[in-house]
Amino acid sequence: MEIAGIREELTDRYITEASAVIADRLLETEEYSRANTVMCYLDYGKEVRTSAIVERLWADGKRVCIPLCTDTKAHIMEAKLYTDETVLVPGAYGIMEPPADAETVPAEEIDLIVLPCVSCDRSCNRLGHGAGYYDRYLPGTDASLIALCTEKLMSDEIPVDEFDVPLDAVITENDIYRRG
């Protein structure tokens, strides 16, 4: 079965249970421990849930930022500061986002970026949603890159092109896969 079909069949229970384990694994990584500023996506649809991760980031005193799609034609995004007082608004794709006037966090200040995916492989290649927002954003940062993916959505091999940025790690409920 193709990834899209598998993804649609994922139950909320499976996603919730896998997300809890994945969050625990992320919080135990060296990348998390070292990070002062973390950019984390807000989950949408069948993505690994991130609300517990964001809560822990705040509890651990880390500076949290989330993506804001600033140009849907050119597929450009920025990192915006996210606090427990930030009022989110529905974005261009129905994903909750910070308001456009929220403080921008420069890419070079971000230590860790937690990315969503449609699928990943064990070589730490990521298949995104196809718009290329992260592919355009990631070259501007030296942050550690970790994608969260349920094991059921892992692929044997993700095709890559010159614009794809390899990840440092992929975390599933079963393992942490590292590049190299």
Question: For each of these PLM feature ranges, what is it?
Answer:
Residues M1-E109:
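N-terminal active-site beta-alpha-beta segment that forms phosphate/nucleotide-binding
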Residues T72-G180:
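Conserved phosphate- and dinucleotide-binding cores of soluble alpha/beta proteins
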